[in-house]
Amino acid sequence: MSQKGFIMELLAPAGTMENFMAALESGADAIYLGGKVFNARAHAANFGIDELREAVRLAHILDVSVYVTVNILIGDTELKDLEQYIKDLDSIGVDAIIVQDLAVAEIAKRVAPNIHLHGSTQMTAATLDAVRFYESLGFTRVVLARELSLKEIQHICKHCKAEIEVFVHGALCVCYSGQCLMSSFIGGRSGNRGACAQPCRLPYELLDSKGESVLPKHEAYLLSPKDLNYSEHMNELVAAGVTSFKVEGRMKKVSYVRQVIGTYREILDEASIHENQRKALASGFNRGFSTAYLEDTVGRQMMTVVAPNHQGKPIGESYTKKGEVYLSLTEPIEQGSLVKILQSNGSVTYYTVDDEWTCVSDTLYKGRPAEGLAVGQLYLASTPKNTKSRGLQEFTRKYDMSVYLSIGSNGETNYTELTAILDSGLSVTVTNEYVPAIANKVPTSLEKVTEQLGRLGNTLFRLSYVDIPDGPYMWPASVLNALRRDAVTALETALITHHVESWQALQVTGDVDYDFKAQHELSYDTCPMISARVDEIEGVKAAISGGAQKIVFGGDRLSRTPYALSVYDEVARLCAQSDVICTFATPRVVKDDEVEAYKHTLEAIVQAHPDSISIHVPQALLWLRELGYTGAIEADTGLNIFNTPTLHFWEQLHISCVNPSQELTLKQITEIAKHSHIPVETMVHGYTEMMISEYCAIASFVGTGSKVNCPMPCVKESYSLKDRKGEIFPIRTDPYCRMHIMNSHEMDMRAYVPMLLQKGISILRVDGRHMKPSYVKDIVSQYVGIATGTMEAPPKKIDSQGESITRGHYFRGIL
């Protein structure tokens, strides 16, 4: 039986125990959080095991689920610690783990089979068949890519068995999650390891082919998206079949969690949204709001453009008069509030409205702030902080408990009995050996009994009714206290047991009846070899002429113009003529509404009879089987193979070659190659793709402002981004109008070819998609010469003339 259809879950973030309690109190149905290790918010406070144990206990008493993020790529040296960590999570009753790396899933299934597997948005699940693939591996839930439209979400929910989780509020990455290398290649901090430095929140200039900026200087935050806010679309998402509505924010403050979760609780319960709820969401931390992906209106309006930080709640405007600033408000604010002025040139000024300001009226202040005079749109950035920590004494989400004190008997002697009943009907009965006695003077009153039994401040219960036997009985406070404690313990145990049993009864059985194994394995008898990835016919010819023994063609074509389907026959013919291995690649991203069209391309690929097909998305296995493909399959970089267990997973599917993560060091690749039964291929030359985004800066700022009806200026000339340090990042677009941001430095590993081959890397790939054909031929021929010993490798030291090259992550690890 599937959990799908039984619940509608509001899923809250928690980066600290205080935030966790706020999420519980605000009405969350489930809470996701990270431990001190192995999670994608390494800079949050996060939870130690003891703290996590208490959090799980409290949540389960309230029938709230707890999901722990284990959503990063795992290195081989971490696997032993990871296994113990998952065992620890299992022992404390964690309901599910959120996973990116298939190695984590495989280990969890082996050592903690009761823990549910949830596929992270880092898995880039953007199609129904991606969800079905993860269903077949035992995942009970998949978090969809944030780039999907409502129509795509509806289609996926309707046809899958797994639960679907969708982000509805909070920060948004500009790159498809799980496919971003920008932070790690620029500064060594990887989003795939939970340490993203957020280069997308920095300013950039958009340059044309002449190197000239095409935008005003203050329009600089071209990669910084506004925050998601689907509050107006909750009913549509509910109707679509979404199970879990996820709020981003494990790094946010407790006030944010309390306000946003409480507001979404009201919206879900009332099945409508009111103006006060809109204002509540606007007053919390936000960079401005967008629904562009859900409504399929991707473009300029979804980006912050002039300010990537907290926008605040719009509350009026400022103007100047006789050397003073006037704050004209649409509503009153508290003294001590922080307001932000966004000026027309994009500059931002903050004022603290303290007692230095003159309150002309509830909605008008004037002052001479030291920060200077600023005129523009007025936003409420924050209100005075209440730093008081709230414990269970002040906690409001509690069970009402009725208690009945009575006298029990075993036939020989009497004893004291207490029955506690919750509004749900759950009841427990506890006993005490105390024999009720007739009071000599003053019997214990109902008020006294109520006082003792009502001392429930540090529990999740509150006393709503008390009943005691008729008669002048005396009930010592010590007996009443013991009965109260025992009843609370019994209720907590019963509630936790109910939650755990209900949760464990829920499972998903995938309905994909496919044998994923490749039908044929390609024999690489001539390794080592040089391969070339190209996306033009002239590039194919140049690479073959340079001596490449393998051509990888297609996939993410770095050109807006789509291929004619006949191109695949032509590439296969050219490769066959020269006895060169012909491999066709899939894109790194295929959205759900693109699947049917892409299958026509894939059909042409299959009919061209390549030697192999290299997949960047796991669901391609399903599509190839549907098309009757019986050839070899290879695993490429989009699959994020980061360790030996993940390698072995793909080997079991009879994959012929593996191209592991580009964030691995040479030492890590060597470890994988040592345990691999198939050739390992890695990129050694070319411009690495740093980002792939559904959003396109060219369409947004040079075209029409959105991808709809874009005149495709990218076809007429090239564009690039320039950062604060003067680095130039070329922009390329593909036939789906996606934006690909390339590295500013060209990878060049010619000096290390002998070392790479000695370390067990069998195939060295030149990525020539960003090169002219003549350069492709020259570079490929040099790698062939060095690999075969007919040409000497250049010096390893990078001189001043070679400062524009990079060694990637071969000798520089990631955080």
Predicted regions and their residues:
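Long, basic N-terminal domains or extensions that often function
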Residues: 140
